Amino acid sequence: YDTWSDVALHNMLHMSVSPLGGWRTIIPSAWLTMAYKEERIDTKDSRNFVFNGKGEMVGFRKYSLRASNSIALVDDEESTYYGYRPGVSAPFNNKEYAYFKKYSNWDIYENENDASPQQRSGINYRVIRLADVYLMYAECMIKGGTDDTGLSEALKYINRVRRRSAIELLGQSTDLGAEYAREATYNETIYTAQSLMEHLMYIERPLELSIEGHAIRQIDLRRWGITKQRFQYLSQQKFTNADPQGTPYTTIGKDGKEVKRWGARLYRFNSTIHTEAQKIVDYEQAAGNYNEKMHAYYPIPNGETMANPNLYNK
């Protein structure tokens, strides 16, 4: 098949997300990046332990396994990206504070151009996977946030997803449905169906399923009826990549020399120390322009309406 064909046995998503041999035309939004950065790890889980060369534990992972396997962050020194630490291998310039790892060949190449033939990737396109099914099941158990009777079951399945990535679990460890009470950390929060639904909508589904499936996030927002609301909320959130005290992220490169990455880390905007010129804001145009009647669904193709003159007849 032609490289550009939609029916080829390969895809080109790696070219869109990668800064190394790719076009980096798809970059994680600021709010999503910050949500990944702020995920709380389970400090009881040995997968989050960091050891020195002597085998001695010296601390914990800075970012969750879910974050590290979804996006590349310049200061994620416990993960690799195209053969090296992210801050060594990737440029992180032009306000590029993160890159999607999903769909890229970061684990087998040092550059996407290493593929043969080039611009072709054999990574499967994830239409749906078990985590999505678990999260939809949890949503059903609380009936979209209206029924508390299914809370325990919903939490059980959300926590199965979180446990896979060694993230702090939700709910109370004393709950009858707490499967990992002895070996995992729970946040000990008492949830209602509504508060758990909000967590599903704004944290769990977007972080677990980012850029997967066929427009999963777009369809989720549409079926919940909150697309415009979400755009408006996110357009009010401010972030910045301004280096603290003007100090860049510094690491040691492949050649043993010092490497500096300026403006490569994302922070929450603080008006007391940051200027308006330093702010990064998501979805400003979308918040102003989105119209549900016009944009929620694609129009029926002209070819279909021409071929079927009775399409709109009632």
Residue ranges of each PLM-predicted region?
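Polar, glycine-rich mid-to-C-terminal structural blocks
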Residues: 1-53
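Acidic/polar-rich alpha-helix caps and helix-coil junctions
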Residues: 1-4, 58-314
